[in-house]
Amino acid sequence: MKSIQMDNKSLFKEIEHLVLNVSFLTDIGLFHGKMGHVIFFAHYGRLVNNDFYEVFASELLDEIYEEINTCLPINMEYGLCGIGWGMEYLVGKGFMDGCTDEILKDIDNLIMERDPRRFHDLSFRKGLGGILYYVMIRLSSPRETDNLPFDSLYLQSLREVVLEKDFSKEKSLSFLIDDFILVLDGKKKIKPDLSVLFQISLPEKSSTDLLQDGLEYGWQILESGDVDKLYKEYPWGKDRNYYLINEESESANYGIGTYLNQMIEAMKESDYSLTIITLRSSKTSSLVIEEKLNVRYINIGSTRCKMNVMNWIKYFERYYRSVIVLLSTIAAENQNNIFHLNNMHMKDLALGLKENYPLSEIICTVHYMDWKLQLLGDRRKLDYILNHPNDRNFKSISIVLEENKKFLKLCDKVIAVSQHSFNTLVEVCGLPKSKIVFVRHGIKDEYKTMSQEEKGSIKRKYGFHSDDTILISAGRIEPLKGMDLLAEAFSSLVSEYPHLRLVIVGGGSPDVVQKKVISYCGRVSFVGFVNKTDLYELFSISDVGVLPSLYEELGYVALEMMMNGLPIVVGNHSGLEEIVDGGKYGLVVPFEQDYGKSKENAAILYTVLDHLLKDNSLRENLQKKSRERFISCFDISCFTRFFKERVIGINNEKTNTLS
């Protein structure tokens, strides 16, 4: 076998990449598929003394049992003989328990259905040569009785084929042909051996891609036996470790990204070493680690398989299992670990952490629940769905909700970011109140007092006049955020307020919104996604902040507006209403929870905005109250204090409500 050279760093990355992707291979065979990788990981785990890899190999083997079918060819390369040979090998090496006559009975019967006399391909990988080798291995397998796995008629037909066929063109099979008759007559036994396998069948091409053509290369790696070249652990910091696990998504540019920043602030000067792990990252296809300002950042790549090609529940189950294997090189089982899961789809990750890190604590934050987004938080609709579980129109909502419940029950603590979220966790998900901690979001106070001259300068910078009255909204442009309602309400306001301008900040598709303001396009600015500095500048020159969401768990944008002293108008039925305390610190629009009521909702929004624009004293009063509310409830110091007390146990306070 040709020697292939690779540096250590590349080797680690190849193995990590393999862990993430092997479960999604459609080939379950020996040379390029799952069976070959089962053998690799079984040996690898034993060599580097990491049980996670041996368990991983066993779970891959279970997948082979699930996916094997009668439509597979019977050859050695990617068919039944190769899979059967692999199982004989695993039992022989002590990686797998059981009687191979029982395990392989169905495979042996399928192989006997094919008449060997009709084979024209005599090669080892795809033809008769491989079948002969498999039969030799099976006949040599230890057994307590004289009962053979193949009947006498089939064995006689193989004897005739070996004596009659011309194998001279297959030079690598010469010793196999000689030995076959001896094994058939009970005069010799042979054991499955990988090195012999590759002597018989030279690889068609040399590859260092363990995923596609890596069985030969993987075996060469293992034969070296040099653990330092094969395995790397990533030890870290203190005895107490806090792992915040997130998934890459567009929301990282918005709320989730802000949450990570507030977590970094909250963990400063704590006894825990903070690691932020981003899953399904586009930055790598394996695992990448870097450190910044005493925080370790780990990116774990996605898979070659796209989630839409298989059931999403199965996809996450397999992906998160792979993540658990990679985490074994990062998090020690005997350390004081807290795993904080930042996504409601992480049920299988939580399950794996429970099983493999029994001394650790698992926490999750409920940023949102899918059913609330789809139903706009309407409990009446949810009650209908729960009472009609077989209604096909809502089947997906029922399935996701049940998965969410299973996930939450696996967690030791569940963080609710709003009171209505707390209530939902108790009433809908059935969680005991003692398991839930209520910690509102908080952000760092970056408010800057500005003179009228400074504000005028910023207005000119963005193309506004000094006497313009600016309404501003920020968030992704989609129906849920109510931007179309704002555009329609604005179209009704412009005739009454000649200096009124509308600024919409955020990504998404503005087409629907633009159509509603086509006659006033010169007075509407779509600025797209902007950085925080520019966003806060825009807030500083605006007169009213408008967040007309039909549903929102607890919006960071509202906190940023209040921090900057903006009077805000928000939708009801969500955490936004809680932020303004039901109308004490901002105006609440009584929307109907129905996309079909857009005209009615736009009219209600128009009425509220018209009232606020006409009443200067109300705006000035809400400016002061908005800022006061932020300082007393949503400054980062509030979040940090309650997080340390209620989540990581500093001061041992265990209250579940905030004042």
Model-derived regions, located:
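N-terminal subdomain of nucleotide-sugar transferases
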Residues: 234-285, 334
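Membrane-proximal helix-turn-helix segments that form the acceptor-binding/catalytic region
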Residues: 370, 386-414
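Carbohydrate-associated surface elements
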Residues: 420, 442
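Conserved donor-binding/catalytic core segment of Leloir-type glycosyltransferases
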Residues: 465-481, 487-490
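Nucleotide-activated donor-binding/catalytic signature segment of Leloir-type glycosyltransferases, i.e.
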Residues: 513-533
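Short alpha-helical donor nucleotide-sugar binding micro-motif in glycosyltransferases
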Residues: 529-530, 537-542
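Aromatic "clamp/platform" in nucleotide-sugar-dependent glycosyltransferases that forms part
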Residues: 550
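Short hydrophobic beta-strand element within catalytic cores of glycosyltransferases
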Residues: 567-570, 580
